[in-house]
């Protein structure tokens, strides 16, 4: 019975503060929309895929060659991000991007047990993301045989105007802002109730003063 009473009291508190529950999420929504559309910069990611094959001698078996390539994938990913590659890319862009900037744009990944390396570049310009990731891949493919004993480096897919917008994600930002607004409103409401020590109802007299109710004066 007490649980039911507490639930009714909780709902009454929320109902009494319904304006705050509506206004605060709306404010958060408007602020989030303004930041998303007018302040937060757009980010675009372009990707390429690269396959690296190890050189094999006449005594090598195909399976051993594949296993060796798989074990070397982590090394390849580090080489792509190394100054040896990025310095050259920076020079080919006539210093428009420093090595540090290129490294900050770059992300290199690969799936487990796969020889395929995915090179991704994220910038604020769609066409620049395409250009940079393609240039990094070409420099790596050209220089890799000189760095390690590899048979060939194949660019499986290049970026051709296929950079995708990765941020800001409008729908996610707006939903999060509404949730934040609701949570803030509820926190404010219950904080206000906890700090308000005034006796407002007969139940407050019984719970706070421990006195029985003998009678009450009705409002007219």
Curated annotation (Swiss-Prot):
GO annotation, biological process: capsule polysaccharide biosynthetic process
Phylogenetic lineage: Bacteria, Bacillati, Bacillota, Bacilli, Bacillales
Cellular component annotations (GO), alphabetically ordered: plasma membrane
Protein name: Capsular polysaccharide biosynthesis protein CapA
GO molecular function: protein tyrosine kinase activity
Source taxon at top rank: Bacteria
Keywords: Capsule biogenesis/degradation, Cell membrane, Exopolysaccharide synthesis, Membrane, Transmembrane, Transmembrane helix
Major localization listed first in the record, in broad terms: membrane
InterPro entries: Bact_polysacc_biosynth/exp (IPR050445), LPS_length_determ_N_term (IPR003856)
């Amino acid at each position: 019975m007490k649980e039911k009473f507490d639930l009714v009291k909780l709902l009454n508190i929320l109902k009494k503060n319904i304006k705050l529950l509506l206004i605060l999420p709306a404010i958060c929504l408007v602020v989030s929309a303004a930041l998303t559309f007018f302040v937060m910069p757009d980010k675009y990611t372009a990707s390429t895929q690269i396959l690296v094959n190890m050189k094999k001698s006449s005594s090598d078996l195909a399976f051993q060659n594949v296993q060796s390539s798989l074990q070397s994938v982590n090394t390849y990913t580090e080489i792509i991000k190394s100054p040896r590659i990025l310095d050259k890319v920076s020079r080919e862009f006539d210093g428009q991007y420093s090595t540090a900037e290129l490294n900050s744009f770059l992300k290199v990944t690969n799936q487990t047990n796969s020889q395929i390396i995915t090179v991704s570049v994220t910038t604020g310009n769609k066409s620049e993301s395409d250009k940079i990731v393609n240039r990094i891949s070409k420099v790596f493919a050209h220089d890799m045989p000189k760095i390690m004993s590899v048979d060939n480096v194949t660019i499986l897919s290049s970026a051709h105007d296929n950079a995708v917008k990765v941020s800001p994600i409008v729908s996610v930002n707006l939903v999060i802002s509404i949730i934040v607004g609701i949570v803030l409103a509820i926190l404010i409401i219950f904080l206000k109730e906890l700090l308000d020590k005034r006796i407002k109802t007969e139940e407050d007299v019984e719970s706070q003063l421990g006195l029985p109710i003998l009678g009450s004066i009705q409002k007219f």
